[in-house]
Amino acid sequence: MLKNQIDIQLSTKRKEKPSFSDLKFGKTYTDHMFIMDYSREKGWHDPRIVPYQPITLDPAATIFHYGQTIFEGLKAYVSENEEVFLFRPDENIKRQNRSSVRMCIPEVDEDLALEALKKLVSIDRDWIPNQEGMSLYIRPFIISTEPNLDVTPSQTYKFMIIMSPVGSFYKEGMNPVKIAVENEYVRAVRGGTGNAKTAGNYAGAMIVQEIASAEGYSQVLWLDGKENKYIEEVGSMNVFFKINGEVVTPALSGSILEGITRKSVIELLKHWGVPVSERRISIDELHVAYQKGQLEEAFGSGTAAVISPIGELSWKNEKMVINNGETGELSLKVYKALTGIQTGKEEDPFGWRVKVE
């Protein structure tokens, strides 16, 4: 499909923009959205940018009953020179297609998806906040739309992209968060859908998040679903620990989402010559390191928060206070490097930044 086939219908009535200084994450949406349809007969067809609007679905659409859906998340940034950038959008598109394969959804042409992203961001570029720590959050997603109660893959789909100006994901910002280690529920198991960005993974975690929030924690640290001892993710983020000078992050096991920020952090650390390893790490090993005074820092990484320092881990009846509950030096360095590249303040030796004309 040719990129110039994207039809553009501009809104004749633009929305009133909110105060960017008081944004709630994911509550406000831009003037336009991207939509493309799929059918077995036509494949993906009719790519278009239209005014932001509701969509109509049959009550029997398979998305409502069997959750055949995937989504992505990335951001657009504006520089001090008013240039607009995306951060590694090609990686998001590739991951979207990997998730699609796992959920039996047809893949989208990567070049077309990137062009759709660029055009949509370009049209709504004045929605990108230019304040420190703010950005335009972009949510591509695919839903199954065929009216069919049989448990079979849908024969029709919609691929859509919506966008939302956002501030910090956590109210704490770059201040350390408190995390509860989850010992009862699990997020995913090997061979399941843990490495796909699909809705059910997040819905199934909500009860645990609600319990943790009620007890004063920002997120939960998930353990593996088989032995309930190996660390996997923290909330909706990948997780890193600095132990005795080495940075350790759980190896991708098939039940952990392949985070793009995670990948970027690892590449940054290697570029700086910081020892980093991807391996299995148990909560017991982490606890021993803490008791020995070797657990120097911990942080989560993800698109929404970028880097979120962890100041406290609650496990069983013990609270592990990390780095005196303060933001670690390495956490801050990684955050500044990533956001500097994303916003054009720093050089980009990796070619991660993609300019939007």
Locations of the language-model features?
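Flexible, glycine/charged-enriched surface loops at secondary-structure junctions
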Residues: 109-111, 127-135, 220-223, 273-283, ...
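Intrinsically disordered, low-complexity, positively charged segments
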Residues: 2-58
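Extended Lys/Arg-rich, glycine-bearing segments that form polyanion-binding/interaction patches
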Residues: 2-3, 22, 89-92, 97, ...
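Short acidic-glycine loop/turn motifs at beta-strand connectors
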Residues: 35-44, 70, 77-82, 89, ...
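Conserved phosphate/anionic-ligand binding catalytic regions in large, soluble enzymes, centered on
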Residues: 58-75, 304-308
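Conserved catalytic-core subdomain
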Residues: 2-20, 28, 171, 179, ...
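Active-site-adjacent loop/helix segments that line or gate small-molecule/cofactor pockets in enzymes
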Residues: 27-35, 49, 62, 176-223, ...
